[in-house]
Design a protein with these regions (language model features):
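Acidic/glycine-rich phosphate/pyrophosphate-binding loops and surrounding catalytic core
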Residues: 1-108, 112-119, 135-140, 146-148, ...
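Short secondary-structure boundary segments
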Residues: 128, 151, 173-174
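Glycine-centered loop/turn positions within well-structured domains
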Residues: 132
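Short, charged, intrinsically disordered terminal tails
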Residues: 173-191
Length: 191
């Protein structure tokens, strides 16, 4: 029993430390935006084979999951916009092709935001927007769609970003850069 424990303890402790680090980091982000109404969400950037566990750790830390897989929701990204010939066209094509699936649209300018709002988007990812532009996006949207700030976020800027009125902060670092907690286990001789 003791030798088997010595073989298996390090991988188990590494996994526990990794997941605990994610939960702890998420908790810090959640605390940073407390009282603002904004929620912390993870992204699709997870470790292969560990997605469910990492997303569970985010929930344990008080955050929300963006999506578990492509079947949960569609995310229209910049490459889709180029392929479709515009952000509104990309959104409309996905909405028509998958009518029952929630569609989030990534925009990188206020002009693109206006286009997707006119097309009927109900969830918009604001990519690398400065804080002033986030506030302007909230003003322009007037509650017609949920807004998610993404890109360039830090724990130090989280409260300021949340104060703009966005609904979500998308934080990829929760799963791809969270520090691993130092967790150990010691065997003790039987009495």
């Amino acid at each position: 029993m003791g030798s088997e424990m010595c073989i298996r303890d390090r991988p188990a402790l590494n996994l526990i430390g990794h997941l605990s680090g994610i939960a702890t980091a998420t908790g810090a982000w959640v605390a940073a935006v407390h009282g603002s109404g904004a929620r912390i969400r993870d992204t699709r950037k997870t470790t292969p084979g560990l997605r469910r566990l990492e997303k569970y750790a985010v929930r344990c830390g008080g955050g929300m999951n963006h999506r578990m897989s492509l079947s949960d929701a569609a995310l229209v990204k910049d490459n889709h916009v180029v392929a479709a010939g515009g952000v509104a066209a990309a959104f409309t094509a996905v909405r028509e092709r998958f009518p029952g699936v929630p569609v989030e649209v990534e925009v990188d300018s206020l002009a693109q935001l206006d286009e997707v709002l006119a097309a009927g988007a109900d969830l918009v990812l604001l990519d690398n927007f400065p804080v002033a532009d986030l506030a302007e996006a909230v003003r322009r949207t007037q509650g017609r769609a949920l807004l998610e700030a993404s890109g360039g976020l830090s724990l130090d800027s989280a409260a300021e970003v949340a104060a703009t009125g966005v609904d979500f902060l998308a934080v990829g670092a929760l799963t791809h850069s969270a520090p691993v907690l130092d967790i150990g286990a010691d065997l003790r001789p039987e009495d």
